[in-house]
Amino acid sequence: MNYEEALNYIHAVQWAGHKPGLTRTRTLLSALGDPHKQLRFIHVAGTNGKGSTAAMLASCLQAAGYRVGLYTSPFINRFNERIQVNGQQIPDEALVRLVERVKPAADAMTDIPTEFEIITALGMLWFAETKCDIVVLEVGLGGTLDSTNVIDPPECAVITALGMDHVKELGPTLADIASAKAGIIKPGSPVVSYGGVPEADAVIARTAAERHAPLTVVDLSRLTIEDGDLDAVTFDFDGLNGIRLPLIGSYQPRNAATAITALRVLRSRGWNIPDSAIRAGLEQVRWPGRFELLRHSPVFLLDGSHNAHGMRATVQSLRDRFPGQKFVFLLSIMADKGVDEMLALLLPLAGQFVTVAAHTPRAMPAETLAEQIRARGGRAEPASTIEAGVARAVALGGTGPVCALGTLYFSGDVREAFAKLNQ
C-alpha cells in the first residue's frame, strides 16, 4: 500500500456518513490493543473555537516540555494535519503502516465503522506509538456519541463557545446542543467551560454536578484586549500581561483565556506548566485558515467561519481591524448551514461577492448562492472553480481588502490558488 492508496482506503465510500455511537470505535480499538488506554487527554468540545483552543493548548504544553499529540478536523492542506505530535504531522510512511494495521480490523467488523472512527483509531495508534505525554483531542461532532468519547476520564474536559450548529444531529435548542457537548464530562474529571449562554451553562453545570466533576467557568471579566494589528492581538488575562497572540481574530483572546484556564487546572493536578510556557506557547501558536492573513497589502484574508455563530465573531473582527471598509467576499457555504443569517451579517460589509462551491456534496452551488445574495440586494457573481473565484475576487478587490470565508472545506484550495496567482 502506498500513501495514495492509504488515503483512498480512509476516504472509501463504504465508511461514509455520520453514525453516532461508541460501540464501533470500542470494537475497533479493542482489536488494535486499546492504544487509547496508554494515553492521557485534554478533551475539547464546542461549537466554535475548539480547534483554535486545542492548538493553543498543544502549543503551551509543548513549550512546557511535554510530548503532545493533537487530533483535529478537518484538514486544510493535507490529511496528515489531523494527527500531529509536537507540531509535526504524522509522516506519510507511518500513516500507510498504520492504515495497513487498521484495515484487517475494520474490514472484519459487521457494523461498519465510519471514516471518522477509522481516523480516530489511527490517531490513537500514532499517539501511543510516539509515547505522547498528553493528547489534545478535539471532538468531531457533539460529544456524548462522538467516537473520541471512548476515552477514560481526561485530565480536563474543555467546552468552548456554544451556538446553533448541527441541529439535525444534536437537537434544535441550545440546551440540546449543550447536553451533547456536556457528554464529554466524565466522573471526577475537571471541566472548563467558556460559558456566557445561560441556557447552555445550566445544562453544563447540572451535568458536572451530577458527575462530581469540578467545574471552572472562564472568567472573561479578567480579560483585557490591549490592541490588535494585522500581525498580532495583545491581551492581558488573569495576571498574564502583554501576550502577543499571532491569531488576529478579535475573538481569539477569548479562546486563549479558555486555554489558559484549562492549563491552570492541569497545573493544579500536578502538571508542570509555568506561566512562561503559557506565554511562549501562545506567542508561537499557528492555526491556519482562521482569520489568517495571506497577504498584507492589498489585504487577502482566509477564514473558516461556517455557521452564524462563528460568522458573527468574524464580522466583528473585520469591523475591528478594517473600520469602515468594504470587502470583496469570496464565499462558499454549506447548504445545511444558516445561510440567511450569515448573508445578513456579511451584506453590510460587502462591496461585492464572488461565489464558489467547495469540493463537497454539501456545498451550495455557486449560482444558487449568488442568486440568494442578489435577492437580498447584494452584488454577486458565481465562479465555475475555486481557482477562477480567487482570481476574480482579487481582480475585483484591486487595492481593497478581499476575504475568503464560509467554510473550512475550501481553505486549502483557496490557499493553493492564491499562491499560484502570486507566483
Question: What is each PLM-predicted segment?
Answer:
Residues 183-191, 321-327, 349-354, 398:
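Short, surface-exposed connector motifs at secondary-structure boundaries
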Residues 110, 118, 131-138, 154-239, ...:
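Acidic, Mg2+-coordinating active-site environments of NTP-dependent enzymes
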Residues 1-48, 52-67, 76-78, 93, ...:
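N-terminal leader/targeting and accessory segments in enzymes
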Residues 18, 22, 26-37, 63-152, ...:
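ATP-dependent carboxylate-amine ligase catalytic core
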Residues 38, 134-137, 145-158, 162-163, ...:
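Nucleotide phosphate-binding/pyrophosphate-handling subdomain across enzymes
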Residues 407:
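Active-site-proximal loop/hinge segments that shape catalytic or ion-binding/gating pockets
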Residues 127-133, 269, 320-325, 393-401:
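Glycine-rich phosphate-binding loop signature in dinucleotide/nucleotide-binding domains
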Residues 194-216, 230-234, 299-302, 308, ...:
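C-terminal helical cap/extension that packs against the catalytic core
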